[in-house]
Amino acid sequence: MSLKIPKILVTGNGGLLSPYLIAAADIMGDVVATGRKSGDIECDLLNENEVKVLLRDLNPDWVVHAAGMTDVDGCENNPVKANESNYLTAKNIAQNLHNNAKLAFISTDQVYPDNIGPHKEKNVGPINVYGRTKYAGEQVILQHPGAIAIRTNLFGTSLTARRESFDDFVISNLRMKKEITLFTDVFFSPIHMKTLSKMVFDLLEGNYTGVINLGSRHGMSKAKFGMEVAKHVGVSTEPVTFGISDMIVGRAQRTHDLRLDVTLAEQGLGYIMQTLQ
């Protein structure tokens, strides 16, 4: 008897991560991508009736909810929109998805406080609107019996028009010999989007539930990461200057040390997370 091929719904089509998620989902099952104005099926996730119809008609086995507002400063300047994008969409999905389905929510490392990392999953304390609305989204998602909330930070080449990753920013500016400032006081544990996407589906297939950090082992400063990216692609770092994040006036507050403790991930996945070097 053949195993059932899962029907997979990926939200957030048109986002930075979506092409990688869709490619990984396509290996695992039959995938449908949705966005507000793009994707296989258009759906306004803020409209609960549209979400109900989508989930009823598609009847997915697995859902990866990757849609949301990720601009930290944009969220701070428009908290209502941030709440709608990061909490209300999650609520509409979680409360209308049948209980036998599995649900993964792409959250953020910005839920952690401005303390020294690496952060364990229980160490929550967001200091900006983005982190608070994503954490609210986690809370409602986790009311679904088969849910995972994935806290992460991404890198990798953007495959989405008009969307740029941090390493894209570094490479494109240095290739044009434009000066960039890399922060020495910000630390993180980014993971490549292709690797992350595979892990999302490994966790769903393995019936993992709860909150989990997915990131690189150990992590590093954004300054060091930017220099490593430049070295990897062979561009000159002459235009690089170094600074601290607090030198920029008017930005939303951000946690300085976003390094992730990936012990639970290694236990849940059964393998050691990669380092950045």
Residue ranges and their predicted role:
Residues 5-27:
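N-terminal Rossmann NAD(P)H-binding glycine-rich loop of SDR-like oxidoreductase domains
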